[in-house]
Amino acid sequence: MAKELKVYEIRITLNGSKPPIWRKVAVSSDITLGELHEVIQIAMGWTNSHMHQFILQSKNPKPVQQKQPNSTVTVEKKVIELPDGRKGYVISTKPCDDSVTPKPVESALPWFNTSARNFVTKTTPWGDPTEMEGEDEKTVTLGEVCPKVKSKLIYEYDFGDDWEHTIEVQKIVTPEPAGKYPICLSGKKACPPEDCGGIWGYYEMLDAVGNPKHDSHKEMIEWIGDHFDSDAFDLEEVNAILAKWRKG
């Protein structure tokens, strides 16, 4: 018997942000991690210009052995230990061909679509795909890795700036008969600009932009412009983009 589909209400929080930058999203339990990656990009306001990975926390993680031969995209699932002592799985997709670039997604922040998209960088080779071991995120569902309320996983975006997000399941409910998922339910604060140096670089940028006497004020204004509002979040705009995404 097929498992009954549920709706997961998840909170996505950008780690290190104060006050928290977060989104609450309702998704189907059968959404794959590959699809969830795209939903996170849209809901947060990223542009999918860099690589990503999911870290699935586990008390007793065991690596999965799986070959992915003759592919231009390698996938890897391995056990890692984070600096704070946490251990978990990593499921990630890694292009091994430097001609492959991540596919941009439409952003909820209009200025991203006209500027940051032009700065999509090409990836570097990651090695022989026949030697990689792992599991494709496109074959793993959220319901499989987060089976209950309070289940968590880490989503890391951009291995240079290291934007780490915590995804927590807050509710598991029955789908509404006319419900359309995914849908963003709420959120706070704007997404940081791409390539600004991570969470610490972002707050340094805000300090510089807000202080005309700051040594980098002029430089930051020229880079970010005078229209960036760190408090802005447009729920309707996010859901309009998610509606397009649902249609493929």
Language model features: what each stretch is:
Residues 1-248:
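Short linear regulatory motifs enriched in tryptophan with gly/pro/ser
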